[in-house]
From Swiss-Prot:
Binding site for substrate: K45, N69, S70, M71, G72, L73, N128, N194, S195
Protein name: Probable dihydroorotate dehydrogenase A (fumarate)
Encoding gene (name): pyrDA
Note on cofactor: Binds 1 FMN per subunit.
Binding site for FMN: K45, T46, N128, K165, V193, G220, G248, G249, G270, T271
Pathway where this protein functions: Pyrimidine metabolism; UMP biosynthesis via de novo pathway
Top-level taxon in the UniProt lineage: Bacteria
Family (UniProt): Belongs to the dihydroorotate dehydrogenase family. Type 1 subfamily.
EC number: 1.3.98.1
Cross-referenced HAMAP family: DHO_dh_type1 (MF_00224)
Pfam families in alphabetical order: DHO_dh (PF01180)
Cofactor(s) essential for the protein: FMN
Amino acid sequence: MVSTKTQIAGFEFDNCLMNAAGVACMTIEELEEVKNSAAGTFVTKTATLDFRQGNPEPRYQDVPLGSINSMGLPNNGLDYYLDYLLDLQEKESNRTFFLSLVGMSPEETHTILKKVQESDFRGLTELNLSCPNVPGKPQIAYDFETTDRILAEVFAYFTKPLGIKLPPYFDIVHFDQAAAIFNKYPLKFVNCVNSSGNGLYIEDESVVIRPKNGFGGIGGEYIKPTALANVHAFYQRLNPQIQIIGTGGVLTGRDAFEHILCGASMVQVGTTLHKEGVSAFDRITNELKAIMVEKGYESLEDFRGKLRYID
């Protein structure tokens, strides 16, 4: 009997699939829908300290091979998600969930993380260092000096399981430099990747989203090769105790299989979940299991990270 069970930081999950932060996770109702689906767990919308409206609409557009968005971190504020998770972990103590968060400044990031540290939250925390869609705010993880400083400051007080969501990197030297920084800290996971920032999609003679004159993060099939490269590059470079969540271009079980083959311990679904709804988790899981049966694999460990090279 094949199994898609997995674990992150010692927490076990019945399935390796989950939503990506930003999709099907704004409200408790959406999170409940993911929780009750075939997904192994969920991650909340990336929370800031206070409620954010986000960027003006239209700010999301499905396009033939994926999506473009410039949402601008709309969310209901940290307390909304943290209170829900604190209640949920008492009701469903056998399951573990992810809380995504980021501050609009380094000071706010520390305020948020200290609040989580002081709470009774027992799940996994994901610090988003990679949002490309807040005007005037750079993607932190492209600035290695700032990333190093923030992680040093965070781990001076934060002792709960923490991972970071990363933007896509495109240069081998950047993989080396980023991994050298991440290996200095007790990170539990890195999430590769957020949307590929600042693409343009045009219909007729116009952009399709309003913020930033149409520039937005690209998701879906467009980014799978980049996502796989990031997953595998960090799998090769990171300490074994830093696991990898693969995100980007997961439409089918084959896509999920490739993320795991490259080294991912969990796989997030974003654009496809937005287009198809939570039934996508069932379909992708069944497709993944069919591939495993065909290849004679019984568990994810049988093929995780075992990408073959050409001599």
